[in-house]
A protein has these predicted regions:
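A solvent-exposed interaction/effector surface
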Residues: 60, 64-67, 83-301
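Sequence-specific DNA-binding recognition helix
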Residues: 22-42, 68-104
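Conserved hydrophobic/aromatic pocket- or pore-lining residues that grip, position, or stack substrates
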Residues: 14, 38, 253
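Short, charge-enriched, intrinsically disordered boundary segments that mark the beginning
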Residues: 1-8
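Terminal helix-turn-helix DNA-binding modules in bacterial transcription factors
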Residues: 8-25, 44-80, 107-126
Length: 301
């Protein structure tokens, strides 16, 4: 089964069972892939998580049912998988901007979220440089924040996180003695989001005395043991602000490289390596920034 057919079959399965309790393992099975691979590919490809798609489709349908004037709020809430009218009302208002009761009024403005259909568009014909590398296990020390699953908020979340944790960053930079390279780690993916870390490799002397040197401040950090494994490594173009290119590159990997590669995404941390050399007044250096994406992969069975 090709990947487009597989994803469409999974979407069709969701739509056929939209008013029932959905099992994500069953959904992934329709695409002949693992739950982790399917959900990661789905979110990168579509720009939202599978859970967000299901929730938006159910709330869109709920608005239509209530606008007809015949459905009871409690019945619609149960069909959408909510345990109580209160939790349904909160979700409905967040999606539509009005309460379920207001949706039953004449001329109520509602939001629609259409069914997803995968279409084949002839793209590509472009070069993509990549390498497959067996990475050794490594230890990173970093600080994290839980990011929501909504990618529309990710840019703001990332920006706020970076601005609000400058002290944590400068401490690790000083201990690592690395000033032009920062690691990012994404792990613990779920319907609600994922853990996002800024991290650095620290020398042994810094790790040995970490708690003693930092005291209570050390509690702000986590030591991350990244397991050895196979990674697909791709790089953005060199420019002043390469972080803006990361999402587009990740989508290209999923749509252009992964489907015909014979590999799948495996359940391991996704690593980013931000190369940020700086030399005051030197445009050549300052326009040579780039980001490496390390996607954990394994051979498809």
């Amino acid at each position: 089964m090709d990947w487009i057919t597989g994803i469409q079959r999974a979407i069709d399965y969701v739509e056929e069972h939209l008013n029932e309790e959905l099992d994500y393992d069953d959904i992934a099975r329709q695409s002949a892939s693992s739950p982790f691979h399917f959900q990661r590919v789905f979110s990168i490809l579509c720009g939202y998580t599978l859970a967000e798609y299901v929730r938006s489709r159910r709330l869109s349908a709920a608005g239509l049912k209530l606008a007809s004037g015949n459905a009871k709020v409690i019945d619609v809430a149960m069909e959408c998988g909510y345990d109580s009218p209160d939790s349904f009302s909160k979700a409905f208002r967040a999606f539509h901007g009005i309460t379920p009761s207001q949706a039953r009024g004449n001329g109520a403005m509602l939001r629609s979220f259409s069914r997803l259909n995968i279409k084949v568009t002839l793209e590509g014909g472009n070069e993509m440089q990549y390498r497959l590398e067996e990475k050794p296990a490594m230890l990173l020390t970093g600080y994290k924040r839980r990011f929501s699953g909504n990618p529309l908020d990710k840019g703001e979340q990332d920006h706020n996180f970076a601005c609000e944790t400058r002290v944590e960053q400068y401490v690790l930079e000083g201990m690592s003695r690395i000033h032009d390279t920062t690691y990012t780690v994404m792990t613990n993916f779920s319907d609600s989001g994922y853990d996002f870390y800024y991290a650095y490799p620290l020398p042994k002397w810094a790790l040995d005395d970490f708690e003693d040197d930092l005291g209570d401040f050390a509690k702000r950090y986590t030591h991350l043991q990244i397991p050895a494994g196979l990674y697909l490594v791709c790089e953005t173009e060199r420019c002043m602000f390469p972080t803006a290119l990361v999402d587009a590159l990740r989508r290209r990997i999923v749509t252009e490289w992964l489907p015909t590669s014979g590999y799948v995404l495996r359940n391991a941390p996704e690593i980013g390596v931000i190369h940020w050399p700086f030399e005051d007044g030197n445009d050549a250096v300052n326009n040579s920034h780039y980001v490496e994406i390390w996607l954990p992969v394994s051979k498809a069975e």
